[in-house]
Amino acid sequence: MEFVVSNTNLRDLSRIFLNLSRIDDAVNWEINKDQLILTTLNSSRSGFGKVTLTKKFFDKFTFHPDTLFLTGFVSPTVRLSTQIKPILSIFRNKIFESTLLVNNNLNTNAGAAESSSKKNVVVENIQMQITSGKECRVIFKFNCKHGVVKTYKIAYEQTQTLHAVFDKASCHNNWQINSKILKDLIEHFGQKTEELTIQPVQGRVLLTSFTEEVVHNKDVLKQPTQTTVSIDGKEFEQVSLNEGIIITLSLKEFRAAVLLAESLGTSIASYYSVSGKPALFTFNKGKFMEIEAQFILATVMGPDDFDESSLGARWQQSGTANSSLLVPENTSAAPALENEAPSASIGWQTNGDAETSRMFHSTLDIPRNEEPAAKPSRQTTDEENHPLFLEGMPDETELMAFDNDVADDAEFGPTQHEQTYHGIFSQDDTET
């Protein structure tokens, strides 16, 4: 199997991996004859990210089913999993080596002409190949000008992937906004802030975070801090919200969705029903939707949730409206909203055969005696002990450094315009 990504889409691909790494340290690949799907699920099963790249995203898309994958039979879909940190290392190592060569040449009197040529060296395309057999690797080949080829190999393991079952048509609260506006607003919240509350109030939407008192090592915050930013209703391209519905979710995963949408230059849309039920954040890029992303996050259930008296006016506004419209909520509609909420819950199902698949259902109350599902053991080889095969989540400093390098590096070409989470997934032992 071989996939070729042009210089034009290289930056988008790097940002996809970067923001998926904010959710978990592993990324699942699902490949069929029409598309490549990248997914990641965090350890607490409270956040999920999915990015679909269609054939039109690639300059070349060659898919060959492998008889050695999973079932032992020819399958129309290939599924595998890789650590995401080595993939980030590939891009960062390439950027670092390129910058180092330029800086060294600038420090020599005789190397001015050579450094100028180095600056003009760009990656023309990337070839991604997947091999099986004795050497199971995902191979990245960076084809640069002047015949320079940089090759990196990442080990993978066979896996079963999960896909969301989310009925956004049943979500009565939704909005859409330019992701650049949202990115500028969430920069007011600290990197270590865990939660974010979204609340509509009188034609505006409030984003609120609360940081408790912290006295730990070098982190000292003597007083609790609450930060609130307000979004005017006119900033939304479309909005339809019940003012009594307030949701609280993880800021880390929410930030990943917003930053990816902003880097792609798209608007981001959100769908949710009530607090305690998952929220969907989605966006796409391209005339033919070459890139489509979905982030599904668990929300925290507060003590006053599902209180009919808390439902206020319903606020609706479209992009063509000159002003927001406040519609008094029909008192008989509140119970209906509560009754319909469960249909907006999210489930997960493996993509295996129907007779062997399992369903993972949304839940917020996990029995105390239930142990979280352990990750499958991972076999390692001597080659995987190489520094390139690093495991674990990259910290925020590494992610910011990578993001800055991608933004500044000429090789990427032009920019294209725990309150505790119980988790939204618990495994149902009954096979369907």
Swiss-Prot record:
GO molecular function: protein kinase activator activity; signaling adaptor activity
Protein name, UniProt field: DNA repair protein rad9
Gene3D superfamilies: 3.70.10.10
Main function: Acts in DNA repair and mutagenesis. Involved in promoting resistance to ionizing radiation and UV light, as well as regulating cell cycle progression after irradiation.
Chain residue ranges for the region called Disordered: 363-389, 409-432
Keywords, comma-separated and alphabetical: DNA damage
One cellular component (GO) term of this entry: checkpoint clamp complex
Similarity comment text for this entry: Belongs to the rad9 family.
Entries under SUPFAM superfamilies matching the protein: DNA clamp
GO BP, sorted A to Z: cellular response to ionizing radiation; DNA repair; mitotic DNA replication checkpoint signaling; mitotic intra-S DNA damage checkpoint signaling; telomere maintenance
Pfam annotation, one family: Rad9
Domain of life per record: Eukaryota
KW Hydrolase (keyword) present: no
